Amino acid sequence: MSRVANNRDWADDEDLEDSNELPQSTTTTNKDGTQTIVTWRFNDDGKKVKTTRRIRFTKVKEIVNPRVAERKSWGKFGLSQKDAAGPASDTTSVGENIIFRPSTNWRKDAKEEVSDAGAMKNKLKDKQVKCRICSGEHFTAKCPFKGTMAPLGEEGAVDVAAGHADTPEGPGGLGAGKSSYVPPHLRNGGTAGGERMGGGKFERDDLATLRVTNVSEMAEEQELRDMFERFGRVTRVFLAKDRETGLAKGFAFISFQERSDAAKACEKMDGYGFKHLILRVEFAKKAS
C-alpha cells in the first residue's frame, strides 16, 4: 500500500507542490571581479519576480595619521562607556560635510572685489555730515545754534553787529497777486520773525552770541571760556572739532547772558593774539 502511495504518475504536475515557495537566492562571482546576485520575490499580483543585480566592489585606501587611527580604536569611557559603537545623538554633533570647489578664476574675482571695495571707499571718503549753520560735523537739526544764527551764506539773514536788516521787498502779509499761504516768519520780506516762547530771555541770548574765527587747532573750549568770562557771564561755548583727528576746525561760538558783555568782549578780543594766531571776533548773524 505504501509503495502505491509513493509512486507518482508521470502526468502529475511536480510544480504544484512548490507553487508557494520562492527559489533560493544565488550569488555568482564573475571573472572581472564582480558578483551577480539573483533574488526572487512576489509582486502585488502574487506573481514571482526575479531580480538580478551586478555588484562591483572597490577598495579605497586612505592614509591617515597613526595617532588618529589609534584614537579611533579607543573604547568609550566615562558616562558613555555603555553606549553603543558610533556617535550618539545626545553627546555628539556631526557637522555638515562641506565640499570645497576651487575656482580657476579666483585671482580675478579677488581683484574685482578689492577694486569695488576701494572705489566705494574713495567715493565715501569725503562724505561727511556738515551743519549748514555752523559747519560743524553734526546734523543741522542738532546744531546748538540753530535758533541763534542763520545758515552761512543764506540771503535775508540779519546782521546783528551792524544793527540793521535788509529792506523788505514786499508789503508783507499774504503774497501779492497770489492766493498761496505765506508762513508768518516769511511775511514782511522775511525780516519779521515770529514770537519766541519765553520772551526776552531767548531774545537776549540770540543777540549775545559771538562768532570767533581763526582759532588755533590746539584750542580747547575751557580755554575760550576762561578768556571770554572776563567780560561777563558766558552761557554757552561751542568749538567745532574734526571728528577723526579731534582738533579744532578754526571757529567757535561764544554766547553771553547780556548783550553789553558780548559787545565789550567783541571790542576787546577782536585782533587778540591766541596761540600764535590773531582772533577774529564778530557778532553771529541772527536767524531770520
Curated annotation (Swiss-Prot):
Compositional bias ranges of the Acidic residues kind: 11-20
GO molecular function: RNA binding; translation initiation factor activity
Residue ranges with Polar residues bias: 21-35
GO cellular component entries: eukaryotic 43S preinitiation complex; eukaryotic 48S preinitiation complex; eukaryotic translation initiation factor 3 complex, eIF3e; eukaryotic translation initiation factor 3 complex, eIF3m; multi-eIF complex
A Pfam family of this chain: eIF3g
Keyword Cytoplasm: yes
Biological-process GO terms, alphabetical: formation of cytoplasmic translation initiation complex; translation reinitiation; translational termination
Annotated stretches, region: Disordered: 1-35
Ranges where the RRM domain occurs: 208-286
Coiled-coil ranges from the UniProt annotation: none
Compartments in which it is found: Cytoplasm
Presence of the UniProt keyword Endoplasmic reticulum in the record: no
Keyword entries, A-Z: Cytoplasm, Initiation factor, Protein biosynthesis, RNA-binding
Membership in a protein family: Belongs to the eIF-3 subunit G family.
Subunit structure: Component of the eukaryotic translation initiation factor 3 (eIF-3) complex.
HAMAP family referenced in this protein's UniProt entry, alphabetically: eIF3g
Function: RNA-binding component of the eukaryotic translation initiation factor 3 (eIF-3) complex, which is involved in protein synthesis of a specialized repertoire of mRNAs and, together with other initiation factors, stimulates binding of mRNA and methionyl-tRNAi to the 40S ribosome. The eIF-3 complex specifically targets and initiates translation of a subset of mRNAs involved in cell proliferation. This subunit can bind 18S rRNA.
Identification of the protein by name: Eukaryotic translation initiation factor 3 subunit G
Organism, as annotated: Botryotinia fuckeliana (strain B05.10) (Noble rot fungus)
Lineage, opening ranks: Eukaryota, Fungi, Dikarya, Ascomycota, Pezizomycotina
Gene responsible for this protein: tif35
